[in-house]
């Protein structure tokens, strides 16, 4: 018991000393060494029965009592690590915080706030550019969606490597993404414009068919967060109509592929009208081709030709 009291006082003092450095990475590296040293001491000369109480002392004094302070440190705190994509340091932080009951709750609180704040910056920058126009440009939509996709891609990487795919961390990221995406009232329109820019004939995106499918898949990952899917449908229908009427659709296959993705997310009823528009256009083209074929076979020519879609 006396030995435990000595170790308890030692680690309380050690925590105070380490906190003065205000360097989270140094703090956690030191904590990691202390865990290893206690394990080696027990293996060498102490009873295995002392492992649990000693472990509790080190975890409580070095971690549990200072979680928020460690996370908020200006050098190596979680926000700094996320900004600099310091994945090894984040992995150490996750691994140690996971040892104590409230560790991941504290980490996820900061993670959630970080993602929300960075998302708000994306929103504010884009919405400031579009505030004086009722119809945002494709460039604005592309900028917003690309920034959101880049953010999600980076966070997915952090989740997989640093946070070991932890479900609670994934939930924190998703909650924050959901929050800031839906704070942008133009998100449904931006996503539809982004898709339109990729499916329109003549754009640099539509001409590269091998790269198109992965882009559409990534777009769906953002679409999932949108609450106002009826608003998105309205814009998507308008943009699809414009592509079809102006003969600007890159390909029927690409259009149907995108609609199939929306169907998986929202069901048949959601895409029924969109599928109907494509089917009507295809039928119109087939009837027109058959008509011209008949004219050619009969050697008949018309003084005036019109294409009506």
Named regions from a protein language model:
Residues 1-3, 8-309:
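Eukaryotic scaffold/interaction segments
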């Amino acid at each position: 018991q006396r030995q435990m009291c000595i170790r308890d006082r030692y680690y309380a003092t050690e925590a105070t000393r380490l906190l003065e450095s205000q360097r989270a990475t140094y703090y956690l590296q030191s904590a990691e060494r202390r865990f290893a040293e206690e394990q080696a001491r027990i293996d060498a000369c102490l009873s295995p029965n002392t492992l649990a109480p000693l472990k509790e002392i080190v975890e409580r004094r070095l971690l549990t009592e200072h979680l928020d302070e460690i996370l908020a440190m200006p050098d190596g705190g979680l926000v700094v690590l996320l900004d600099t994509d310091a994945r090894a340091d984040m992995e150490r932080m996750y691994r140690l915080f996971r040892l104590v009951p409230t560790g991941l709750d504290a980490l996820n609180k900061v993670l959630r706030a970080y993602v929300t704040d960075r998302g708000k910056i994306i929103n504010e920058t884009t919405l400031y550019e579009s505030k004086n126009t009722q119809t945002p440009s494709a460039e604005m939509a592309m900028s917003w969606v690309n920034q959101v996709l880049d953010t999600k891609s980076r966070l997915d990487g952090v989740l997989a490597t640093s946070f070991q795919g932890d479900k609670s961390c994934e939930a924190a990221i998703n909650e924050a993404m959901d929050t800031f995406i839906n704070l942008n009232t133009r998100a449904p329109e931006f996503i539809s414009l982004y898709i339109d820019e990729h499916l329109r004939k003549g754009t640099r995106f539509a001409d590269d068919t091998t790269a198109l499918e992965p882009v559409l898949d990534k777009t769906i990952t953002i679409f999932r967060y949108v609450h106002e899917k009826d608003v998105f449908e309205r814009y998507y229908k308008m943009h699809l109509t414009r592509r079809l009427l102006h003969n600007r659709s890159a390909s029927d296959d690409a259009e149907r592929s995108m609609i199939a993705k929306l169907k998986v997310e929202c069901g048949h009823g959601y895409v029924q009208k969109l599928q109907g528009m494509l089917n009507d256009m295809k039928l119109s083209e087939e009837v027109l081709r058959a008509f011209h074929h008949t004219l050619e076979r009969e050697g008949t020519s018309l003084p005036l030709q019109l294409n009506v879609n």
